[in-house]
């Protein structure tokens, strides 16, 4: 691929760039910042050389970069084994990660198919107008053609236009956006001027129009659109779970095992879904197909069943019986909203004794990890995870190395059998909880060798480390680090 004139100039005169191959330029922090500022549309691949998924993506990414060059769209890459600070700055948690920038800002993280055609189509879409002008005559057709939520704003002010366009740029992959300066049209839809109306296809709503009444700022408008797009009472599956998770609202999950049961439960929960639509959402889950999710939600496998899950903290509030009557559900949901319920925490038994490698469970996690007199390194693992098994002998040796240091704890926890408040996106995940800063744990992103893990502890330690003399331990086989979604998403 011929590199564009702009990139060629940067390569020649800026120390921020160097060529990874003839196809896709590799950039460091300085070079990436220059590109973000200069390029109208840019995709950045954050990767690791050892990552199998990254290797599979490489030819597709290179061919897409070649085709998109004529459109003035740049595709570049960042090697996270060389640019660790840069990857941390962008909160890279797995490889490959594809971030998209437009007009100097990150607008999205690409999650579509990692194929040439899909990449090209997605990036060319970024060049299209984000907000479509609309009139009274074209409104109906605009709304009907929308696959999901259709958002229409009414204003004349340029500042309001800039704010609305900023939101639309970030959310345009999921929704369609239009704008009008017609005051009478806004009034006929029940909106103020300026104002925003979201058109929904949710049958559980009383109206197909949701009117925004909040402040005209990007965060508030985005929250309104995000929440409006989530059905009040829908089916939970692989396609819809992400929406519920991204909303930030607690989710009431209704387990059913027959069509008749679902129909009866709809009548019970639909009024509650409408009443509490600003507070939580509700969804049905087929217990015959997805019964294993009940275990993750701390629910007994008796149907029907109901649980409210906080998808941020992953705290679960299961209803204790199968008697899901309107009266019982009204009280239970009301008590949750009023903060009267206590979550049910799943925990393995606390070990009677501990070795050099401390075993954590949910019931002792805070006592050990949040101890402000200790630095604590924690491995979050799954018993079935091959990478975790490969790491085990090295991690045990690491614990032995720091066993004489009373200020350092090396620990592990089975994240599949214990409820934890830490967000885990893959196994193993290793985090360092500093004695003087428990709120901001440091995620380990390096090679899983004894030397690198030990250096990581020493770098971030709150105290002068005291270690036993080390014996050499062979590095575990670092095959492709496969990021795994959280347990519930896997089951779905």
Swiss-Prot record:
InterPro entries referenced in this protein's UniProt entry, alphabetically: PDI_thioredoxin-like_dom (IPR005788), Prot_disulphide_isomerase (IPR005792), Thioredoxin-like_sf (IPR036249), Thioredoxin_CS (IPR017937), Thioredoxin_domain (IPR013766)
Site (Contributes to redox potential value): 52-53, 386-387
Catalysed reaction equations from the record: Catalyzes the rearrangement of -S-S- bonds in proteins
Signal peptide annotation: 1-22
Acidic residues bias locations: 477-492
Primary localization: endoplasmic reticulum
Domain of life: Eukaryota
Residues of the site described as Lowers pKa of C-terminal Cys of first active site: 114
Disulfide bonds: 51-54, 385-388
EC number: 5.3.4.1
Lowers pKa of C-terminal Cys of second active site, annotated site positions: 448
Family membership: Belongs to the protein disulfide isomerase family.
Protein name: Putative protein disulfide-isomerase C1F5.02
Natural source organism: Schizosaccharomyces pombe (strain 972 / ATCC 24843) (Fission yeast)
């Amino acid at each position: 691929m011929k590199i564009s004139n702009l990139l060629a100039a940067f390569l020649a005169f800026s120390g921020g760039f160097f060529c990874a191959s003839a196809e896709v330029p590799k950039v460091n922090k300085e070079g990436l910042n220059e590109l973000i500022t200069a390029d109208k549309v840019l995709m950045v691949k954050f990767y690791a050389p050892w990552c199998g998924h990254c290797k599979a993506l490489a030819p597709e990414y290179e061919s897409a970069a070649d085709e998109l060059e004529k459109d003035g769209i740049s595709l570049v890459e960042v090697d996270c084994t060389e640019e660790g600070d840069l990857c941390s700055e962008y909160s890279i948690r797995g490889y490959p990660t594809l971030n998209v920038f437009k007009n100097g800002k990150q607008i999205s993280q690409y999650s579509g198919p990692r194929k040439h055609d899909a990449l090209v189509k997605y990036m060319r879409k970024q060049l299209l107008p984000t907000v479509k002008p609309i009139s009274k005559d074209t409104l109906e057709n605009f709304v009907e053609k929308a696959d999901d939520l259709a958002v229409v704003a009414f204003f004349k002010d340029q500042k309001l236009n800039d704010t609305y366009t900023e939101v639309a740029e970030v959310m345009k992959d999921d929704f369609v956006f239009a704008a009008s300066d017609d005051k009478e049209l806004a009034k006929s839809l029940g909106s103020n001027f300026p104002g925003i109306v979201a058109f929904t296809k949710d049958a559980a709503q009383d109206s197909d129009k949701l009117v925004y009444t909040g402040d005209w700022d990007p965060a508030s408008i985005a929250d309104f659109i995000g929440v409006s797009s989530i059905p009040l009472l829908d089916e939970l599956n692989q396609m819809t779970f992400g929406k519920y998770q991204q909303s930030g609202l607690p989710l009431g999950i209704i387990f059913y095992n027959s069509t008749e049961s679902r129909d009866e439960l709809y009548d019970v929960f639909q009024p509650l879904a409408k009443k509490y639509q600003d507070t939580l959402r509700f969804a049905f889950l087929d217990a015959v197909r997805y019964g294993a999710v009940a275990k993750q939600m701390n629910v007994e496998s008796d149907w029907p069943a109901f649980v409210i899950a906080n998808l941020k903290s992953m705290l679960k509030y299961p209803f204790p019986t199968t008697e899901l009557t309107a009266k019982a559900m009204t009280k239970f949901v009301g008590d949750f909203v009023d903060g009267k319920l206590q979550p049910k925490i799943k925990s393995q038994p606390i070990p009677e004794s501990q070795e050099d490698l401390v075993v954590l469970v949910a019931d002792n996690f805070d006592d050990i990890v949040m101890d402000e007199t200790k630095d604590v390194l924690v491995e979050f693992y799954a018993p079935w995870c091959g990478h975790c098994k490969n790491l085990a002998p090295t991690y045990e040796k690491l614990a032995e190395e720091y066993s004489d240091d009373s200020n350092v704890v090396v620990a592990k926890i089975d994240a599949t059998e214990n409820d934890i408040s830490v967000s885990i996106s893959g196994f193993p995940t290793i985090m360092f909880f500093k004695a003087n800063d428990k709120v901001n744990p440091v995620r380990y992103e390096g090679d899983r060798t004894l030397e690198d893990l030990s250096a990581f502890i020493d770098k971030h330690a709150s105290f002068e480390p005291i270690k036993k003399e080390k014996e050499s331990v062979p590095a575990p086989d670092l095959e492709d680090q496969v990021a795994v979604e959280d347990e519930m998403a896997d089951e779905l």
